[in-house]
Amino acid sequence: MLKQFIRISARMLAGLAALVLTLSTPAARAERPVLKYKDQITVKAPPQKTWDSFKTFDAIHTWHPATEGTKLLVGQNGKALAVREFRIKGGDAFVISELLAFDEAKKWFRYRIIKTNLPLSNYVGEMRVKSAPGGGSVVLWSATFQRPEENPKPDQDDAATEKLVQGVFKAGLDNIAALNSK
């Protein structure tokens, strides 16, 4: 009886291993690839002035034209683990994000979205300022993210998610340049 039990258990284990291997292949599931997007803009102002115009974590509404009502929920500006919330103008969309790292000397910060009703997930972004060749500065904005669902609606596929992030970056970078062109 014990030998029979061991044989059945071994067959079940082999079958379970085969099932796990089958389900872990890309063809067996609709994977959500990690998407990447980056953009930059050259600004006439020196790096410090440009950095000062967008570095305050709970003041995104002062430089991004699509946002309003930013408030700090946890922590302090310029300190890791600070959490902010802001709304998107003209609707009920919101974003709650967490500051992961901030470096005043290097003019750089990293953040992640922890909750949103926008159609994206697992978003981690970075913003930085560098000196531009010949004067001025360059603002670099990059992010990794995923579409919200494994089997997305047509308007929430990878291309739509990338287009959303591209629009957010363009509007923000263009406004940073406008604020620093004087």
Please give the residue ranges for each predicted region.
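Bacterial N-terminal signal peptides that target proteins for export
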Residues: 2-15
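C-terminal segment of classical bacterial N-terminal signal peptides
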Residues: 19-27
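Hydrophobic ligand-binding cavity/cleft-lining segments
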Residues: 26-76
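Amphipathic hydrophobic-ligand
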Residues: 33, 119-126
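Glycine-rich portal/gate segments that line the openings of hydrophobic small-molecule binding cavities
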Residues: 42, 61-62, 71-119, 171-182
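A short, structured loop/turn motif at beta-sheet edges
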Residues: 46-48, 100-107, 128-138, 182
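A mature extracytoplasmic/lumenal domain signature
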Residues: 56, 64, 90, 101-103, ...
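A conserved amphipathic terminal alpha-helix motif
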Residues: 138, 144-182
